[in-house]
Amino acid sequence: MDLTWVTEGRTTIAVPCQNPDVPFPPGTAPVFYNSRMALNRDSTVLVVRQTHPHSYLDAMAASGIRGCRVGYETGVPVTFNDRDQLAIDLITHNVQSLGIKADITCRDANSLMSDEKFGFVDLDPFGTPAPFIDAAIRSSGKYLGVTATDTAPLCGAHLKAGIRRYMARPLNTEYHTEVGLRILLGNVARHAAVYDKGITPLFCYAHEHFVRLHLQLKSSASAADKSIARLGYIHQCPKCPYRLEEQKFFPGIHTCPLCGASLTPTGPLWTGSTHDPNILAGMIEDAETFIAGDPSGLLKLLALCRDEPDISFSYDYHKLGKFYRLSPGPIDVLLNRLRDKGYRAGRVHYSGYGIKTDAPLEEIRDCISS
């Protein structure tokens, strides 16, 4: 296996050489490494630095970059696991090169997580994490990280696959990214409740081709009940921009008050907060000084998440203007007008044209046309 050295964050490891002349170079290497996921791993390092778990499991380690960064940049003891012996050989090489404290296992991830417990369990599979979530919850002592790259099923483009994997009905709307994030959160919350565990989102977001969750788990029936109480649905009008959030385990039947159409429900999904303000504030402060290289992209994401209103859906600013046949001005002007009227309003972290507000559509329209 031909290797090359890469530096990500403060960590330098060896990774297999890739063919740069194909559409997806990481797929050409004998052991997987995707440089496009560096921001994902940056955020994980910052969360681990805020939470200080006693141990960390990189359950599908591949090249080992995630676990190597956690071990080298936080000092937390890491267990690396992969079922591919080539990956294990590469991880061993990288661990020895970095001199970090680590255990390395070559097992099926579900089998390992069923047998052992870790302070922080991290799932970063190729594709859906759905087959691993149950075992990960049982294995986690306190913290859980989940990456999903199957955004088409999560966000409603592949409806049947989304229903099969996540036992929820996705919806391919203008805010489908938000739907995907909250469906994944809701799925984890339901799995956790089976074991009398509740979830608290620490920093959860959607970026480019993936959804990323960082969660704290609390073991108690009351914590599980509180999580279940935060499950609900978004009801979307198929004919106009009206939408309704409903915190219920089973969806009601609703009619659009503006045009009379039957609303389409999506869910069950998480309707609670997607981040912890204290964790996020600590991550922002840490990122400014700790993350090596240019942290501007990560800092922008963190700031957008910090300022994003705690609302389960968003509007596409341009589509609102088109629907109302108005020429919208700058987004920030609209947001300031809504805030001046006493409404919550802000940008979303996953779209340059997305806005969140609790203002009714009539008020939004009036503020656009002012």
UniProtKB/Swiss-Prot annotation:
GO terms for molecular function: tRNA (guanine(26)-N2)-dimethyltransferase activity; tRNA binding. Residues 4-368 form the Trm1 methyltransferase domain. S-adenosyl-L-methionine binds at R41, R66, D82, D108, A109. One of its GO terms (biological process) is tRNA N2-guanine methylation. Keywords: Metal-binding, Methyltransferase, RNA-binding, S-adenosyl-L-methionine, Transferase, tRNA processing, tRNA-binding, Zinc. Signal peptide: none annotated. It catalyses: guanosine(26) in tRNA + 2 S-adenosyl-L-methionine = N(2)-dimethylguanosine(26) in tRNA + 2 S-adenosyl-L-homocysteine + 2 H(+). Zn(2+) binds at C237, C240, C256, C259. It comes from the Archaea. InterPro entries: SAM-dependent_MTases_sf, Trm1, TRM1_arc_bac, tRNA_met_Trm1_C. Transmembrane segments: none annotated. The keyword Secreted does not apply. Its EC number is 2.1.1.216. Belongs to the class I-like SAM-binding methyltransferase superfamily. Trm1 family. Dimethylates a single guanine residue at position 26 of a number of tRNAs using S-adenosyl-L-methionine as donor of the methyl groups. This is tRNA (guanine(26)-N(2))-dimethyltransferase.
